[in-house]
Swiss-Prot record:
Keywords: DNA damage, DNA recombination, DNA repair. Belongs to the RecO family. It comes from Chelativorans sp. (strain BNC1). One of its GO terms (biological process) is double-strand break repair. GO terms for cellular component: bacterial nucleoid. Involved in DNA repair and RecF pathway recombination. This is DNA repair protein RecO. InterPro entries: ARFGAP/RecO (IPR037278), DNA_rep/recomb_RecO_N (IPR022572), NA-bd_OB-fold (IPR012340), RecO (IPR003717), RecO_C (IPR042242).
Length: 248
């Protein structure tokens, strides 16, 4: 068995004296693990850092085996990301989200999204929005996607302001007004194609929204707790955002 693909490093763990087991999200083969011989060498350690884009060749006798990775660097982002608390927490959070998905289950859209985020993860004004949208995409990949395209009551695509905690569907400001205290606020930048301004309060609403559905559909049923990196990421982003509005 052999395949060739691009990947983004999620993490490694030590294996023996000189090797590591590499975990990467790939373009066509999903989240995949493999042994990298000599992965702890001075040459390979900088390559195998989280956030780096790499060229991967995987070989194994049988498909179900761990297999061996041959790794070549394509884009070394880690040195830049390690200088930012937002980026450090962010890459940990993104990796934790991807580990919720079945191993080797292809998600090319998430791979491409992660590549875009990695390029901006040390930019707090942009990173918060990108990660919030990524969380929506992960929920969708897990089968728990939210319907934010139109109002569940009226069918309107305009002035969507709330999300029903029961159905995960959007509701307009007018239709939701009588039940506003029971609905979740919907930040406008989460609706398709919307580039609305946002501030700390609005970004907090976005993460409260995605966090609610992660807890209900993923963490609680699986007996998991929210990744610690999530609170760390949000706090680091907030420290760099103004109180008023900021462009995404």
């Amino acid at each position: 068995m052999e395949w060739h693909d691009e990947g983004i490093v999620l993490g490694t763990r030590r294996h023996g004296e000189s090797s590591v087991i590499l975990e990467a999200i790939t373009a066509a083969h999903g989240r995949h693990l493999g042994l990298v011989r000599g992965g702890r060498s001075k040459r390979m350690q900088p390559v195998l850092q989280p956030g780096n884009r790499v060229d991967l060749t995987w070989r194994a006798r049988l498909d179900e085996h761990l297999g061996l990775f041959q790794v070549e660097p394509l884009e070394l982002n880690a040195a830049r990301l390690l200088n930012s608390a937002v980026a450090i927490y962010g890459i940990q959070l993104l990796a934790a989200h991807l580990r919720l998905l079945p191993e080797r289950d292809p998600h090319p859209g998430l791979f491409e999204a992660l590549g875009v985020i990695a390029a901006h993860l040390d930019e707090p004004e942009t990173a918060g929005v990108l990660v919030a949208r990524f969380e929506l995409a992960v929920l969708d990949a897990l089968g728990f996607g939210l319907d934010l395209a139109r109002c569940a009551v009226t069918g309107s695509r305009e002035d969507l302001a709330y999300v029903s905690p029961k159905t995960g569907r959007a509701v307009t400001r007018e239709a939701g007004a009588p039940w506003a205290d029971k609905l979740l606020p919907l930040p406008t930048f989460l609706t398709a194609g919307n580039e609305a301004l946002y501030d700390r309060a609005i970004l907090s609403q976005a993460f409260a929204l995605t966090g609610f559905f992660f807890a209900r559909h993923v963490y609680e049923p699986r007996g998991l707790t929210e990744p610690e990196a999530r609170a760390g990421f949000l706090a680091a982003v907030m420290r760099n955002l103004p109180e008023g509005e900021s462009a995404p």
